[in-house]
Amino acid sequence: MIIVVGIGADGMTGLSEHSRSELRRATVIYGSKRQLALLDDTVTAERWEWPTPMLPAVQGLSPDGADLHVVASGDPLLHGIGSTLIRLFGHDNVTVLPHVSAVTLACARMGWNVYDTEVISLVTAQPHTAVRRGGRAIVLSGDRSTPQALAVLLTEHGRGDSKFSVLEQLGGPAERRRDGTARAWACDPPLDVDELNVIAVRYLLDERTSWAPDEAFAHDGQITKHPIRVLTLAALAPRPGQRLWDVGAGSGAIAVQWCRSWPGCTAVAFERDERRRRNIGFNAAAFGVSVDVRGDAPDAFDDAARPSVIFLGGGVTQPGLLEACLDSLPAGGNLVANAVTVESEAALAHAYSRLGGELRRFQHYLGEPLGGFTGWRPQLPVTQWSVTKR
């Protein structure tokens, strides 16, 4: 059995009697250097510090035989090693004794409800994944440099007036809180930030809605326009944790919107044009999502993480591309393809005749001035084919 004991900045004094007894009876305890240093002299077990990288060492543990003990920060099941151990060895082989999490402590200090506060971990993720356009979050830092890195990004993307609080050594005798704005922290960061810190951010509210308008994206005209983007996302039907392949991504607007739809949604964007690939990267960073940007399809398919859903927004008439997309889909996965030319529309109609699914055609109009009046200007019709792989 692997017993995981959560410990806070207050060390042994903050632990329950059950947690203290487990540590005192242990023969071997694994943990980080900081966590192991929190144990007192009543713990006589041999102490093993995790190496870097840590995962191979974790995978080498064996829950069979004598009990193994692991110390972890706060609640080990909240972006912690407890979740990793259960995934590797099963819940029957892992017992978790949680401590109060840094998230709970930070919310208590800020006066925020935990249930409606987003939690973002930057322990291994890039800082741009914590950029938001409104709301509030507790951000778990990777190290002392994380607050400045996030503050700089928020400032660069027009969110510099976001309320920005850095809370260090939560629950311990050296606890400290510093309040300000992202801009102030980016311009004049303190030099004495503790490695053990979290960031409480109240993001500057963006005027733009969650369905971002076309002008919110960097693009050269190759973008799924807003009304069709809404219809396309409805057809793609994202669910939490799914991965999208955006093939012929253009600006990456579909990939970005997909990643913003549900927690855990990720995307891989395939685009042959280098300038457009740069736009996709810029748009992903601006919206605080992570999109894996790759080259031309289908050549770049081989080493990409497998998709749950595929959107084909360009290249419908490219020989073999539609078939390669279908081959890459798992059984039960959805493919949605849009077409605006007669040739690409014919290709989708042919695919529909062979494979079934649903074939739709959308036509929308925009009201525009016509002299002293208003007239309707038709936009290009869009044909959409969606199919579930059997």
From Swiss-Prot:
Name of this chain's protein: Precorrin-6Y C(5,15)-methyltransferase [decarboxylating]
Gene Ontology biological process terms, A to Z: cobalamin biosynthetic process; methylation
UniProt-listed PANTHER family: COBALT-PRECORRIN-6B C(15)-METHYLTRANSFERASE (DECARBOXYLATING), COBALT-PRECORRIN-7 C(5)-METHYLTRANSFERASE
InterPro entries: 4pyrrol_Mease (IPR000878), 4pyrrol_Methylase_sf (IPR035996), 4pyrrole_Mease_sub1 (IPR014777), CbiE (IPR012818), Cbl_synth_CobL (IPR006365), Cbl_synth_MTase_CbiT (IPR014008), Cobalamin_biosynth_MTase (IPR050714), SAM-dependent_MTases_sf (IPR029063)
NCBIfam families: CbiE, CbiT
Catalytic activities: precorrin-6B + 2 S-adenosyl-L-methionine = precorrin-8X + 2 S-adenosyl-L-homocysteine + CO2 + 3 H(+)
Keywords: Cobalamin biosynthesis, Methyltransferase, S-adenosyl-L-methionine, Transferase
Keyword flag Ion transport: no
Species this chain originates from: Mycobacterium tuberculosis (strain ATCC 25618 / H37Rv)
Pathway annotation from the record: Cofactor biosynthesis; adenosylcobalamin biosynthesis; cob(II)yrinate a,c-diamide from precorrin-2 (aerobic route): step 7/10
One Pfam family matching this protein: TP_methylase
Enzyme Commission numbers on file: 2.1.1.132
Family: Belongs to the precorrin methyltransferase family.
